[in-house]
């Protein structure tokens, strides 16, 4: 579910509604901006132009989202090395595996990149070409109450999700993001995107 549904009365529990409300709020955005400081550009009167996706008035500069996600228990990487949408400002991932989930893998992996990434296939999930894929420099385990967040300030912010092994249960997580809406005509970095 995405924030546009989770914020509607009666769709989810009050606890989940409040969780979503906070993580799509100007208060949360400002907390993240404080952490990442100069990596996130100041927007004048940001409190008047930020709203959860699906709740804006059509000309808000920044959209926020809080999404509950379930990936099927298939034994292959659910996400190869890629970069995110250049309009995305930040992304956070909260892992919520079932207590009885004894699978391995499903880790969030941060990659070193080789050279400057200049071009990606938008339809292909912005997967990074083999020539730009470097070694994994950090892995964040898929375990309960683990949260990882990054500022999407570079076309070299390459990350992936490792292959899950012996998975019988869905991989559960919450995505928390903010991104520039198209009306803002802004992005965090420049990159050529093609559709193939």
Model-derived regions: residue spans:
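Signature of the catalytic double-stranded beta-helix
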Residues: 2-70, 81-84
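A structural signal for well-ordered alpha-helical segments within the folded catalytic domains
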Residues: 26-30, 34, 90, 142-143, ...
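Short amphipathic alpha-helical segments and their helix-coil junctions
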Residues: 71-75
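Catalytic core of Fe(II)/2-oxoglutarate
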Residues: 76-77, 81-88, 98-196
């Amino acid at each position: 579910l995405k924030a546009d549904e989770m914020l509607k009365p009666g769709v989810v529990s009050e606890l989940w509604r409040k969780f979503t409300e906070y993580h799509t709020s100007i208060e949360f955005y400002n907390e993240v901006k404080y952490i990442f400081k100069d990596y996130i550009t100041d927007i004048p009167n940001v409190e008047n132009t930020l709203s959860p996706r699906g709740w804006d008035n059509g000309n808000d500069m920044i959209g926020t989202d809080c999404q509950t996600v379930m990936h099927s228990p298939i034994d292959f990487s659910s996400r190869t090395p890629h970069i995110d949408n250049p309009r995305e400002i930040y992304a956070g991932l909260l892992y919520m595996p079932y207590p009885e989930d004894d699978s391995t893998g499903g880790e969030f992996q941060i990659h070193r990149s080789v050279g400057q990434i200049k071009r990606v296939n938008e339809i292909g999930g912005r997967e990074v070409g083999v020539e730009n894929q470097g070694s994994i420099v950090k892995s964040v385990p898929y375990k309960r109450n683990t949260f990882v967040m990054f500022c999407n300030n570079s076309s070299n912010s390459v990350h992936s999700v490792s292959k899950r092994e012996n998975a019988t249960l869905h991989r559960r997580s919450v995505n928390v993001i903010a991104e520039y809406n198209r009306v803002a005509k802004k992005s965090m970095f420049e990159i050529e995107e093609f559709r193939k």
